[in-house]
Amino acid sequence: SSLWLHMGAWGPRRVSTDDTAIVSAPFKTVNNDYSLLDASDLVFIDAPGTGFSRIIDKEMGGSGDPKEFYGSDEDAMAFADFITQFLNTFNLWNSPKYLFGESYGTYRSAALSYILEMGKGVGLNGVIMLSQILSWDNIADLAQANPGMDLPYQLALPSLAAAAWYHHKLPDQPEKLDPLLREVEEFSMGEYAMALSKGSTLDSASSAKILQRLHKYTGLPETYIRKANFRISGPLFEQNLLANNYKVVGRLDTRFTGYSMDPLGKQPDFDPLEAAIFSVFIASANNYIRSTLRFGQDMTYHPFGEGVGGNWDFRHRTPGMPHEIVGNVMPDLARAMSYNPRLKVMLNMGYFDLATPYYEGIYEMQHLPMDPALQKNISYAFYKSGHMVYLNVPSLKEMHDNVAKFIADTH
């Protein structure tokens, strides 16, 4: 649902957060000094089956079928239909228009930009992304299930280094983060990429050199790195960085920590960020909607898709391709930007995010299949926060100012 952006970032009221602190009920909401209402009107759309939206199926007297909505392409089309109907209803066709997506919402926004621009005649001024993922092949969580595809390990490594730096686990702890990240980025796409490409033919001298560098950048023991075959996935890192303290670090935000439920396990049983903030947001949103807005008294607000689970169809028909593939909307965004060369794109990424590592976002943007001249239409902003950048209030203020300027500069 949209409650995270609504109650965490851009709405007129927001959940009071103290960065990584864990709080207990009663939770507080405060006036949001960083709402984007000073820069734009805001329309929060809950995907079908989330929030108060319901799919009216036969049991409810309708003819709706979850299969019509629970899929990458189906979801994007539902959003496109809603947006065009909204423009009709409120006569907003001539207004500047922007998409803002967070996490999966960035994937949706890329697909949606193509549908709106080339299928619906809706000209967009900008697409704003927070914590981007446009290709599932690049995700650090799933790397072990896709042997031979080593790119996710390279793209995640700078974020692993950021986490180890934050928790003071680096053997040679630098004072500043940014120079470290530039060094790791260069290593990831250079020596590390070359070593991984050699697979089982990597010689012992090169192995020792790569092993030493990975230990330097992650703080993990060399024996563990060797057992992992130099390929450190997100879950393995989250489980092992603070293993000596019987703790795990967050996936969505590696600054968050929690007690390990299975110290001998391969991956954490839960995400400490989820444990820290999900109940806070859900309780606060329900209280605000029902007490202040006086809406939904007899309804259940679903923060996540009710009954979606494993029923989501990740297949996507890439523009210009005859067959569906699983999960890559980079061509969609590239075609939208090529069709409308005035369309601007903004990326906002947190350094401590392992769900969608910041360098993966950079890589995807730099590899969009379009004329390189259009790269000038892409801008980047990075924050010392995680997947939900807005949990860190200084980062929220910084992101507000960056996004507000982007909007002002593009209409």
Identify the residue ranges that each predicted region occupies:
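Catalytic histidine-centered segment of alpha/beta-hydrolase-like enzymes
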Residues: 384-395
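Glycine-rich nucleophile elbow surrounding the catalytic serine of serine-hydrolase chemistry
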Residues: 101-114
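N-terminal cap/lid subdomain of alpha/beta-hydrolase-fold enzymes
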Residues: 1-68, 366
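Alpha/beta-hydrolase active-site loop
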Residues: 47, 67-88
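Alpha/beta-hydrolase fold nucleophile elbow
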Residues: 92-104
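Short alpha-helix in the alpha/beta-hydrolase fold that links the catalytic acid
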Residues: 111, 230, 343, 357-367
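A catalytic-pocket lid/entrance helix-loop region that shapes and gates access to the active site
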Residues: 8-17, 117-219
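Alpha/beta-hydrolase fold catalytic core
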Residues: 200-355
